[in-house]
Amino acid sequence: MTAPQNPLERVTLRNPIHFLALGLGSGLLHPAPGTWGSLVGVVLGALLLPWLGAKTFFILTALCFFLGIWLCERTSHDMGVHDHGSIVWDEIVSVFLVLLAVPQVSLFWCAAAFVPFRLFDILKPYPIRYFDEKLTNGFGIMVDDILAAGYSILVILALAHFI
């Protein structure tokens, strides 16, 4: 029996590693699975941040980052493709980080976190593209989105200053 040619045939949502790496299944939505994963991150973050508080939410985000290195590496390996578009755990965790910079959890500020993050994640300005191309492991999958989150946080801080 030969291995499946489609990388998505090599993963299953019944596997908890794949389920998390694929963003609770959101990475299987089309078009633009990264956008769907980011939206899941905004919704989860908007629910968890007020409930946990900023300090605990930051700790959770850091733990999710380190867990994500392993989840994304394993799932990429299982798929036979580095950073397949359906792997969106990195988007979810990075949006969590952006939400930590918003002055309040509201529809406006959630959108203000979501939009620049997606733009930076898609456009990949320097050094995001460099790390995206050079680091071909779980850390690489996670770090390019964390850098996009960093740029997004700068946008949030500027926006908060002027509003």
List where the protein language model places each region.
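Short, surface-exposed acidic-centric catalytic microdomains
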Residues: P31-L44, T56-C72
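Interhelical loop and helix-boundary elements at the membrane-water interface
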Residues: T2-G37, W70-V98, L119-G150
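Strongly charged, low-complexity linkers/loops
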Residues: Q104-A112, F117-K124, I128
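Final/C-terminal transmembrane alpha-helix of multipass membrane proteins
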Residues: D145-H161
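Helix-coil boundary and interhelical linker segments in multi-pass alpha-helical membrane proteins
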Residues: G45-I59, V98-A111, L157-I163
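Membrane-interface alpha-helices
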Residues: V42-V43, L47, F139-I141
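Alpha-helical transmembrane segments of multi-pass membrane proteins
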Residues: A46, T61-W70, L99, A113-I122
